[in-house]
From Swiss-Prot:
This is GTP cyclohydrolase 1. GO terms for cellular component: cytoplasm. SUPFAM superfamilies: Tetrahydrobiopterin biosynthesis enzymes-like (SSF55620). It comes from Streptomyces coelicolor (strain ATCC BAA-471 / A3(2) / M145). GO terms for biological process: one-carbon metabolic process; tetrahydrobiopterin biosynthetic process; tetrahydrofolate biosynthetic process. NCBIfam families: folE, PRK09347.1-2, PRK09347.1-3. Zn(2+) binds at C90, H93, C163. It catalyses: GTP + H2O = 7,8-dihydroneopterin 3'-triphosphate + formate + H(+).
Length: 201
């Protein structure tokens, strides 16, 4: 992780402490009035700790880990992968948000591209951590620009947030859209072309 922060001398952000996570879940169950030793909840702290290790796996990955393989194919037209499933966790309430991401880029003048599946893996790197959708969108776009050095990038993310659906305003089905454009895709005509491809069904 970049710039790790020490927590009272007990570890650094970026280190997963499974036992500590179990204890925290147990304390949370007690705090809401449950009995963590009753049948049905006895193994819940361990299960939740293991689930969090998977759900937040992106904390222990870097974008370079998934974008290391590139190909110089001389391709200079837009590459776009649509409808990449997004599963993430709102950092404000620690409840899920889910939806899709559309990720496109115009390769560098050398024609350097990456595998299509790598774009989906890049989305996962940033989605599998405590997150907000706005930052998620920006991080995907900035990583592509930095690592692939394309002439342009567009990222559009559309998600439903459980923190709006199951609590608070309670509006299930409401979708949030965020976008980030970089380089040549800031050009109106090029951006419109990309958006028409994204919106086409």
């Amino acid at each position: 992780m970049t710039d790790p922060v020490t927590l009272d001398g007990e570890g650094q952000i970026g280190e997963f402490d499974e036992k500590r996570a179990e204890n925290a879940v147990r304390e949370l169950l007690i705090a809401v009035g449950e009995d963590p030793d009753r049948e049905g909840l006895r193994e819940t702290p361990a299960r939740v700790a293991r689930a969090y290790r998977e759900i937040f796996a992106g904390l222990w990955q870097e974008p370079e880990d998934v974008l290391t393989t590139t190909f110089d194919l001389g391709h200079d037209e837009m590459v776009l992968v649509k409808d990449i499933e997004v599963f993430s966790t709102c950092e404000h309430h620690l409840v899920p948000f889910r939806g899709v991401a559309h990720v496109g880029y115009i390769p560098s003048t050398s024609g350097k591209i990456t595998g299509l599946s790598k774009l989906a893996r890049l989305v996962d790197v940033y989605a599998r951590r405590p997150q907000v959708q706005e930052r998620l969108t920006t991080q995907i776009a900035d990583s592509l620009m930095e690592i692939l050095e394309p002439r342009g990038v567009i990222v559009v993310v559309e998600c439903e947030h459980m923190c709006m659906s199951m609590r608070g305003i309670r509006k299930p089905g409401a979708k949030t859209l965020t976008s980030a454009v970089r380089g040549q895709l800031r050009d109106v005509a090029t951006r419109n072309e990309a958006m028409s491809l994204i919106m086409a069904r």
